[in-house]
Curated annotation (Swiss-Prot):
Subunit structure: A connexon is composed of a hexamer of connexins.
Family assignment from sequence similarity: Belongs to the connexin family. Alpha-type (group II) subfamily.
Major location category of this protein: membrane
Annotated transmembrane regions: 24-46, 77-99, 154-176, 209-231
Subcellular location: Cell membrane; Cell junction, Gap junction
Species assigned in the record: Xenopus tropicalis (Western clawed frog)
Ranges of compositional bias, category Polar residues: 340-352
Topological domains annotated Cytoplasmic: 2-23, 100-153, 232-352
Membrane topology (UniProt): Multi-pass membrane protein
GO cellular component terms, A-Z: connexin complex
Gene3D superfamilies listed in its UniProt record: Gap junction channel protein cysteine-rich domain
Physiological role: One gap junction consists of a cluster of closely packed pairs of transmembrane channels, the connexons, through which materials of low MW diffuse from one cell to a neighboring cell.
Name used for this protein in its record: Gap junction alpha-4 protein
Stretches for region Disordered: 330-352
Length: 352
């Protein structure tokens, strides 16, 4: 059982670098093959040769009939099947370990280069190392991306697993069949005539044979399904690689995000210009602030009142403030215009 535990640890490492279908295949391999075969196989098939009895007393007849009925024990046959089916996965694991060790060496070399002083040569060497690391397809979490040469190795392992499964199923059908008969008729030297041999617990052994047959069929189905998945994935990657690049659309395609255009036509000068409608909420509350010109005019009135109130105290009070008064906007009430005939006549007398 120690060798089986070592093999189980190796296959557990493969699970980290397999597809989802490959992980299901490993679960089927461990739970329904290793555990069932290790726990129930010996108890069911332990009396296979000891309880194989033939109705003859001819020496050696029972042994040759047992060898003809069971060229290889069922348990040993299933163990051999398990080893053959697991071997391609171990080759794939070896490729993964090789890529991981290679990445570790590249990282170590990169750290050594960063410690040097010549920046130009260091940058060139680091760029070369980065290109080599990209070819390894190893992600940041340590898992290997199945691409390139690793994809070929994985595809090859799946193909060989499928071939081994199908081959062992055909071999079991040719050697034993899938039903254990209670009586086996043997005619072989040194038996003097046809001999009837009896198998112990044939129904129990038939159930076990059918169970292992179903497990083998499930494993074969998963391998074929994974093979189709990998082929489709590689074809999609190839099409993406050689297809022209189409940049993503920066603007939304849904026309509902923009409000409908109003039926009213724009007035000049914006009538002939195109403009964008932006989505806005109808219930927007604006703060009650005054317009800038209204606020400036209110500030000026306040300062003007303060200046008039302090006119008597200021030494410059006898000067007129009309020179400093700005012209108010048209939207507000304007100051009274001093246009009288008396003032105009007085100005004429002054010039005379």
């Amino acid at each position: 059982m120690g060798d089986w535990e070592f093999l189980e640890k190796l296959l557990d490492q493969v699970q980290e670098h397999s597809t989802s279908i490959g992980k299901i295949w490993l679960m089927v391999l461990f739970i329904f093959r290793i555990l069932i075969l290790g726990l129930a196989g010996e108890s069911v098939w332990g009396d296979e040769q000891s309880d194989f009895i033939c109705n003859t007393e001819q020496p050696g007849c029972t042994n040759v009939c047992y060898d003809k009925a069971f060229p290889i024990s069922h348990v040993r046959y299933w163990v051999l099947q398990f080893l053959f089916v697991s071997t391609p996965t171990l080759f794939y694991l070896g490729h993964v370990i090789y890529l991981s060790r290679r990445e570790e060496k590249l990282k170590q070399k990169e750290s050594e280069l960063r410690a040097l002083d010549d920046k130009e040569q260091v940058e060139q060497a680091i760029a070369i190392i980065e290109k080599k690391k990209m070819k390894l397809y190893i992600q940041e979490d340590g898992t290997v991306k199945i691409k390139g040469a690793l994809m070929c190795t994985y595809l090859t392992s799946v193909i060989f697993k499928s071939l081994f499964e199908a081959g062992f199923l055909l071999g079991q059908w040719y050697l034993y069949g899938f039903v254990m008969t209670p009586i086996y008729v043997c005619e072989r030297v040194p038996c003097p005539h046809k001999v009837d041999c009896f198998v112990s617990r044939p129904m129990e052994k038939t159930i076990f044979i059918v169970f292992m047959l179903v497990v083998s069929l499930i494993s074969l189905f998963l391998n074929v399904l994974e093979l189709i998945h990998l082929v489709c994935k590689s074809m999609i990657d190839t099409l993406k690689k050689y297809s022209p690049y189409v940049p993503p659309n920066r603007y939304p395609k849904n026309e509902d995000t923009y409000p409908e255009k109003t039926s009213e036509t724009a007035t000049a000068p914006f009538q002939d210009k195109s403009y964008i409608y932006l989505p806005m909420n109808d219930n927007i509350s604006y703060p009650q602030y005054k317009m800038p010109n209204e606020q400036n005019w209110a500030n000026f009135n306040t300062e003007h009142q303060l200046a008039i109130s302090g006119n008597n105290q200021s030494p410059l009070g006898h000067y007129s403030l009309s020179a400093f008064v700005p012209v108010p906007p048209k939207t507000h009430s304007t100051m009274e215009k001093p246009s009288t005939r008396a003032s105009s006549s007085a100005s004429k007398k002054q010039y005379v």
